[in-house]
Curated annotation (Swiss-Prot):
InterPro entries: KsgA/Erm (IPR001737), rRNA_Ade_diMease-like_C (IPR023165), rRNA_Ade_Mease_Trfase_CS (IPR020596), rRNA_Ade_methylase_Trfase_N (IPR020598), rRNA_adenine_dimethylase (IPR011530), SAM-dependent_MTases_sf (IPR029063). It catalyses: adenosine(1518)/adenosine(1519) in 16S rRNA + 4 S-adenosyl-L-methionine = N(6)-dimethyladenosine(1518)/N(6)-dimethyladenosine(1519) in 16S rRNA + 4 S-adenosyl-L-homocysteine + 4 H(+). S-adenosyl-L-methionine binds at H15, L17, G42, E63, D88, N109. Specifically dimethylates two adjacent adenosines (A1518 and A1519) in the loop of a conserved hairpin near the 3'-end of 16S rRNA in the 30S particle. May play a critical role in biogenesis of 30S subunits. Transmembrane segments: none annotated. This is Ribosomal RNA small subunit methyltransferase A. Its EC number is 2.1.1.182. It is found in: Cytoplasm. One of its GO terms (molecular function) is RNA binding. The keyword RNA-binding applies. Belongs to the class I-like SAM-binding methyltransferase superfamily. rRNA adenine N(6)-methyltransferase family. RsmA subfamily. The lineage of its organism: Bacteria, Pseudomonadati, Pseudomonadota, Gammaproteobacteria, Chromatiales. SMART domains: rADc (SM00650).
């Protein structure tokens, strides 16, 4: 329980940020500017919401917890123009918030239980995003930034790095939250590539190849991609079919996807 009488709800994955030093450091990393079009996902009790409002004067926020949503609207009434959407961020169309000539900046202390599906949801709307700053489970950030050859490199690494430059910023200890989570967190900055690394490759096509490859990561690439590409085709692309999926670079996954698309 806390000062507003709201117990953190496990089903929402709630851990409320309360460490002022962390909040200030996160604010410096985001560096909000007066004309920014910004949305906060999962504002909770408003630890970041209030300083963002002080900097911007206006803010969009998405909060699924109805009680917290009502509390935030009341608490921020005299602090600035907070437009709160009491909806599920996993199904929210962020394009409704973007303006024709202004992209959206997205920030948030994301619940651990939805962080990966939410990232994929946002990647599907990458064209309207300026950048993203998230507090995530440290393990997730490690996977986002992982390079080929390591155990952390996988589908999430390839897909996010296809869309964004990944910049891990700093670790946040569990004691910065109430209640404290069982693991540490990390703040990460995601900046969309402009122009796209491969404008002719769709999300669906790359995801099809990468998902199939990593669904059987212990197998060789030739076995993992059976039905999509043959060993001979891999060799023609200069890729050793005996390699394992976690050793293949993003550039090679793009080459595999281009080849597969041409063969359709």
């Amino acid at each position: 329980m806390n000062t507003l009488g709201h117990r953190a709800r496990k089903r929402f994955g709630q851990h409320f940020l309360h460490d002022k030093g962390v909040i200030e450091r996160l604010l410096r990393a985001i560096n909000p500017q007066l004309n920014d079009l910004m949305v906060e996902i999962g504002p909770g009790q408003g630890a970041l919401t209030l300083p963002l409002l002080h900097c911007l004067g206006h803010l969009e926020a998405i909060e699924l917890d109805r009680d917290l949503a009502a509390y935030l609207v009341e608490r921020c009434a005299s602090e600035g123009n907070l437009r709160l959407h009491n909806v599920d961020s996993l199904t929210f169309d962020f394009r409704t918030l973007a303006h024709e000539n202004r992209r959206l900046r997205v920030v948030g202390n994301l619940p651990y239980n939805i962080s990966t599906p939410l990232l994929f949801h946002l990647l599907g709307q990458i064209g309207i995003l300026e950048d993203m700053h998230f507090m995530l489970q440290r393990e997730v950030v490690t996977r986002l930034a992982a390079k080929p050859g390591g155990k952390d490199y996988g589908r999430l690494s390839v897909m996010v790095q296809f869309y964004c430059e990944v910049e891990p910023l700093f670790t946040v200890k569990s004691g910065a939250f109430v209640p404290p989570p069982k693991v540490d967190s990390m703040v990460v900055r995601l900046i969309p590539h402009r122009p796209s690394l491969a404008p002719n490759i769709s999300h669906g096509a790359l995801n099809r190849v990468v998902s199939q490859a990593f669904s059987q990561r212990r197998k060789t690439l030739a076995n993992a991609l059976k039905g999509l590409l043959s060993s001979a085709e891999l060799i023609a692309l200069g890729i050793d079919p005996r390699q394992r999926p976690e050793t293949i670079s993003l550039e090679d996954y793009l080459a595999l996807t281009r080849y597969w698309l041409k063969a359709q």
